[in-house]
Amino acid sequence: MIRRIAVSAIAAIAVAALNAPGAAQAQADDRTVLSGVKELKVAFDIVEGDAKGLLNRLNVIDETRASLIKQGVTPQFVIAFRGPATKLVQTDMSKVKPEDRELAGKIAARIRELSKAPGVNGIEQCSVAIRQQETKAENVLPEIKVIGNSWISLMAYQSKGYAYIQP
């Protein structure tokens, strides 16, 4: 009887551990879907104008990049900024909402890290968005290349086999 209770208790603890927060994440992998895949090319179209949301997207892009590498897949990422995100990837803080200024520094730091990370082939800023958001090309973070038109760039990447993701 005591042995049955002990076995039941151990089983209950094991089930609880498997269902604990983070347990599924620790066991999750993408082996099945990545079977036979050696490289993934993705163009991320970033328009998020909320600093917290933009920083979150950049963090998840980096997490995805690192996860692919860990699973033996070479990422080829391009990150393209346009729309309201434009104000958060430049240095003129008068263009950034006061409540977003602290996070703008964290965004700049994350972009610096991403620009040096294996698997990130380019980070771009649309000049059409610069004009529409009333910012200046010379204020774009130095790690970001100012291009003519992100739509044209994104179309070109897709024609070269890049998947399109707008997180």
What is the predicted function of each stretch?
Residues V15-A23:
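C-terminal segment of classical bacterial N-terminal signal peptides
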Residues A24-P167:
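Secreted/extracellular ectodomain signature
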Residues I10-A11, T64:
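Enrichment for repetitive, rod-forming helical segments
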Residues M1-I10:
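Bacterial N-terminal signal peptides that target proteins for export
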